[in-house]
Amino acid sequence: MKKTMMLMMAAVAGIAMADADVDALKAVLEKVTDPETQCRIGNCYAEGKVVAKDKAEALRWYRKAADQGCAEAQYRLGKWYTHYYVIGKKPEAAMWYRKAAEQGHVVAQHELGILYMRGAGGVTNNYAEAVRLFRKGAESGYARSIHNLGTCYMEGLGVPQDRAEAFRLYRKAAEMGFAASQYNVGLYYDKGWGVEKNKEEALKWYRKAADQGLPEAKDMLKLLESQQKK
């Protein structure tokens, strides 16, 4: 069974191998130098694909790939450090996200922006830098970045407060299917924030977000439907 798993792992990593003992298979994997392949091996250990989950091994392989400049591995290291998977290493989160972000990794740009919003992961609070990073993600069409940029305009964080621009961004992300933005668009129509009140539009957007399981959208949908029945 273990031999079969190792052969499957070699296949996942893109290595063609004939039958061999486990130690030989491990030895072949250890000789892998391609960073993209190293990252895929890390994914196997991180996600429990083919082999049992092993955080230490996942990190070891991600680090091998990240040290060679693999943006995906750098992003994954940042994610692990951010979510406390590595005790005492959280300050490294921003470092790894930044390395990936500088290579154009859109999700890493977004996550680094989150750290700047919170003043966490090895960086101090800097709303202007968060906005810059969210804007990069938004320009690449990443819905989460579009939504967060909208929130920055809504709250006046790092940019002058502009509810009209916030609505435009929320609407854009909502049309991409992002539930939190759908909910916010519903709120805009429900409350008349910079747009004409429109309960039907509010219901439509609340329902879209509720259909994706967003609790607050379910609550507002239920409330608005009950009000319309009176």
Model-derived segments and their meaning:
Residues D21-A24, V28, K208-K230:
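Terminal, low-structured helical/coil segments at or just beyond the last alpha-helical repeat
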Residues A18-K49, K64:
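N-terminal segments that cap or nucleate solenoid repeat domains
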Residues M1-T4:
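Positively charged n-region of N-terminal signal peptides that target proteins for export
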Residues A10-M17:
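Hydrophobic h-region of N-terminal signal peptides that target proteins for export
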Residues D19-D23, A52-W61, Y85-W96, V123-L133, ...:
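Structural signature of tandem alpha-helical TPR/SEL1-like repeats
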Residues E30-P35, E47-K49, D67-C70, H83-Y85, ...:
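Short helix-capping/linker turns of helical repeat alpha-solenoids
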Residues R40-E47, R76-H83, E111-R118, V123, ...:
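Hydrophobic face of amphipathic alpha-helices that form TPR/SEL1-like repeat modules
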